[in-house]
A protein has these predicted regions:
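Iron-sulfur-associated redox domains of electron-transfer enzymes in respiratory
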Residues: 63-374, 378-383, 391-402
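Intrinsically disordered, low-complexity terminal
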Residues: 599-607
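Iron-sulfur cluster-binding cysteine motifs and their immediate structural context
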Residues: 2-4, 13-42, 47-66, 300-305, ...
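Short, flexible, mixed-charge glycine/proline-rich loop motifs
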Residues: 2-5, 10-14, 45-46, 285, ...
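Parallel, heptad-repeat alpha-helical coiled-coil signal-transduction segments
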Residues: 458-476, 487-542, 549
Length: 607
C-alpha cells in the first residue's frame, strides 16, 4: 500500500508527541542516532490518520498527495474531470479556486454531495432489505484501514456501501459516462489509500496542498466563483460535519433507528476497540464514525484557518437552507429516482483483511521488558507518565520488547539513574570532606615534625660545638701528658708512677679524639638526613596544600552537580506531571445546534 505519511527525520528531536497521538501500536519506531532519540514511521502499520502531522511542532511529518502530478498532467492536456468534497463550502476562496481549475482545462466539476445522497439512499435500502444487527459506517479510509489491519472481527460490521466520494466517482464513470481521468478535491490524507484500493480515482488532490500551490506561485484567483456540472444535492451537503450521515438517516428513519456516533483523536479508535469487545446486544444499529473531531470540514488535508465555531455556523446556515428548500416529499422522490436509475450493486464494496507483522506477547516477555526499564516495584510498573509516548508502563515494556521503543526513552528510568548518580555524588562529597580533614590533620602533624626537626638540628649544632671543645681539650691534654712523660723520664725511678699516669692520660686523649671524630661524621650524616627529611616534608606539605585545594574545588563542583540534578529532577517531574495532565485532557468539545423546522414548497425533483 502506498506510503502517504512521510518524514524529514533530521528535524526529529524525539519529543514522542507523534507516538502519543497515534492510535496504532508499533506505527512509530524509536531509535538512537548519534545519541539523539529519533522516531520514524513504520509504513506497513500506519493507517494514515494524520494525527502525527498535526501534533508535530518540528515539521518532521508531512503527507504526499497527487497535486503536482494532477497539475502537470492538466498542463499537458490530459482530459481530467474532478469532483469536490462538501468541505469546500467552508473554505475561503474555495469556489474561486474551482473556477481557476476550469481555466486550467478541467472538463467537468461535480459536487460530491451527490455521492453523499447516493450513499444515504444505499444505506437506507440496505438497512430496509437486510435489517442488519450492527453497521459501522466507512466514510473515513483511516478507520477502514484500522479495521482491515487490526480489527478483523469487525470487518463483518463494516458498511458494504461505498463512501460518498467513491459513490460520486462510480456515478461519474457508470452513469454520467465520463471517460476522463478522475481527480478528487479532497480534505483527507488517507483518501489516497481508498482510491488506490478501489481504482476509480486517479488523483487525490488535497485542499491544503492545492491552496499552498496557488499561494506559493502567487496565483491570483478569479473573482467569479464556479458552479457544479450536476444537479443540486440535498442533505448530502451535511456529510462533511460530525454526524452528517446520522442526520441524513434520521431524516428518513426518525428516531426509530439507534445511531451512535464517535469522532476524533482520543475517542473514535478507543470506541472502535470497545465496540469489538462489547456485548452484541448493546451495539447500535448504526455506528457513525469519523477520524477527525470536526469531520471533513477540518480534515487532515484542510488548512485549519477557520474556527470550529465559524465552521458550525456555516453548516447550520446550510442545514437551514436545505430544510427550507427540500422536504420529505422531495426526499422520497429523490430516493425513488435512485431506485429507478441506479443499481445498488454498483455501490457495494467488499473488504479483504490486511496482514501485518505481529509478535505474540506473553507475561514473561512483559516482565523482561520491565527489567530492561529497571522497573521492579509495583509503583515503578504503574508510573504511567506517558512521556515515552505510551499510555502506560505496561505498553512501554511491550514496545521495548517488540523493538518499537527503547529503554532510554523512559523518563522514570532516567530519573532513577540520575538519582543514583546524585547519591554517589553526595557520598563522594562526604568522602572528600573526610579526606580534606585528614589532609589538614596530616599537615598539622607535618608542621609539628618540622618543629621537632628544627629543635634536633639546633641540638646537633650544639653537640658539634661541644665536640669541638672536647677535641680541643683532648689535644691540650695530650700535650700536657706528653710534657709529663718527658718530666717523668728526667726524674728517673721517682717519676715512674707519674709516667704511667701520663701515659693513661695520653691514651684517654687519643680515644677522645677518635670519639669526637666519629661524632663529627655521624653529625654530618644526621644533618644531611635531617635536611632531606625537612625538604621531603616541605614537598609533602606543598602536595597536601595542592590536594586540599583540588578537593575543595571538587567539593564545590559536586555540590553544583547535586544542585543541578535536583533542579533537573524537579523539571522532569513537572514534565511528567504535565504529560499526564495533557493526556487526560478531552480531545474536543462537541457542539450541537437545533434543526430548523421551517419548510418551504419544494421544487420538482429532476436529474
Amino acid at each position: 500500500m502506498r506510503k502517504i505519511i512521510n518524514e524529514d527525520i533530521a528535524k526529529c528531536v524525539g519529543c514522542n508527541r507523534c507516538i502519543r497521538v497515534c492510535p496504532v501500536e508499533g506505527a512509530n519506531h524509536v531509535y538512537k542516532d548519534n545519541d539523539v532519540i529519533k522516531v520514524s514511521i513504520e509504513p506497513e502499520r500506519c493507517i494514515a490518520c494524520g494525527f502525527c502531522i498535526d501534533t508535530c511542532r518540528h515539521k518532521v511529518r508531512f503527507y504526499e498527495d497527487d497535486t503536482e502530478q494532477f497539475l502537470s498532467d492538466l498542463r499537458r492536456g490530459e482530459p481530467i474531470s474532478l469532483f469536490v468534497a462538501p468541505a469546500i463550502q467552508v473554505i475561503e476562496g474555495g469556489m474561486q479556486m474551482l473556477m481557476w481549475l476550469r481555466k486550467q482545462g478541467v472538463k467537468k466539476i461535480i459536487d460530491a454531495s451527490i455521492g453523499a445522497d447516493i450513499c444515504t439512499w444505499a444505506h437506507i435500502r440496505y438497512i430496509e432489505k437486510n435489517n442488519p444487527h450492527a453497521v459501522i459506517t466507512q466514510p473515513c479510509p483511516a478507520i477502514v484501514n484500522y479495521i482491515l489491519k487490526y480489527k478483523h472481527s469487525l470487518i463483518r460490521y463494516l458498511s458494504p456501501v461505498h463512501s460518498p466520494m467513491l459513490c460520486t466517482a462510480i456515478w461519474m464513470k457508470r452513469y454520467d459516462r465520463n471517460t476522463d481521468a478522475i481527480a478528487a478535491i479532497s480534505p483527507c490524507v488517507a483518501k489516497a489509500h481508498e482510491f488506490e484500493q478501489t481504482g476509480y480515482v486517479k488523483y487525490n488532490v488535497t485542499i491544503k496542498n492545492l491552496m499552498h500551490y496557488i499561494r506559493d506561485n502567487d496565483i491570483e484567483l478569479p473573482e467569479q466563483a464556479s458552479g457544479f456540472d450536476n444537479r443540486e444535492a440535498a442533505f448530502g451537503r451535511l456529510y462533511s460535519m460530525p454526524g452528517g450521515l446520522k442526520e441524513n438517516l434520521e431524516f428518513y428513519f426518525g428516531k426509530n433507528l439507534r445511531i451512535d456516533q464517535a469522532e476524533g483523536q482520543g475517542v473514535v479508535y478507543e470506541s472502535i476497540d470497545a465496540y469489538a469487545e462489547e456485548n452484541p446486544a448493546m451495539l447500535p444499529t448504526v455506528f457513525d464514525v469519523l477520524n477527525c473531531g470536526e469531520g471533513c470540514n477540518l480534515g487532515t488535508a484542510v488548512e485549519h484557518n477557520i474556527s470550529r465555531f465559524a465552521t458550525h455556523s456555516m453548516m447550520d446556515d446550510s442545514r437551514k437552507q436545505i430544510l427550507k428548500t427540500f422536504d420529505r416529499d422531495y426526499y422520497n422522490r429523490m430516493l425513488a429516482h435512485f431506485d429507478q436509475r441506479l443499481n445498488m450493486n454498483d455501490f457495494i464494496r467488499k473488504y479483504l483483511p490486511m496482514a501485518t507483522k505481529s509478535m505474540a506477547v506473553t507475561e514473561d516477555l512483559i516482565e523482561e521488558g520491565y527489567q530492561r526499564l529497571h522497573k521492579s516495584t509495583e509503583i515503578q510498573k504503574t508510573f504511567d507518565c506517558a512521556a515515552c509516548g505510551c499510555d502506560t508502563c505496561y505498553e512501554m515494556a511491550k514496545a521495548v520488547m517488540l523493538g518499537d521503543n527503547i529503554p532510554e526513552n523512559c523518563i522514570q528510568m532516567l530519573h532513577d539513574e540520575i538519582t543514583d548518580v546524585l547519591n554517589i555524588a553526595v557520598s563522594n562529597i562526604s568522602t572528600a570532606t573526610l579526606l580534606e580533614n585528614d589532609i589538614s590533620e596530616i599537615q598539622e602533624q607535618s608542621g609539628t615534625i618540622s618543629e621537632f626537626i628544627i629543635t634536633l638540628t639546633e641540638g646537633i649544632t650544639k653537640f658539634e660545638t661541644i665536640s669541638k671543645s672536647i677535641l680541643s681539650i683532648a689535644t691540650h691534654t695530650n700535650l700536657v701528658a706528653l710534657n709529663a712523660s718527658i718530666e717523668a723520664a728526667r726524674a728517673g725511678i721517682h717519676g715512674k708512677a707519674f709516667a704511667v699516669v701520663a701515659e693513661e692520660v695520653q691514651s684517654l686523649a687519643a680515644k677522645s679524639k677518635e670519639v669526637v671524630s666519629e661524632s663529627e661524621e655521624i653529625s654530618k650524616k644526621s644533618q644531611k638526613a635531617i635536611t632531606a627529611v625537612n625538604d621531603l616534608l616541605t614537598n609533602i606539605s606543598g602536595s597536601y596544600e595542592k590536594a586540599n585545594i583540588s578537593i575543595s574545588v571538587l567539593n564545590q563542583s559536586l555540590s553544583k552537580i547535586v544542585d543541578s540534578i535536583d533542579i533537573d529532577l524537579d523539571a522532569k517531574k513537572k514534565i511528567a506531571d504535565t504529560t499526564v495532565s495533557q493526556a487526560q485532557l478531552p480531545e474536543s468539545v462537541t457542539l450541537a445546534s437545533d434543526d430548523s423546522d421551517d419548510y418551504d414548497k419544494v421544487p420538482e425533483y429532476t436529474h
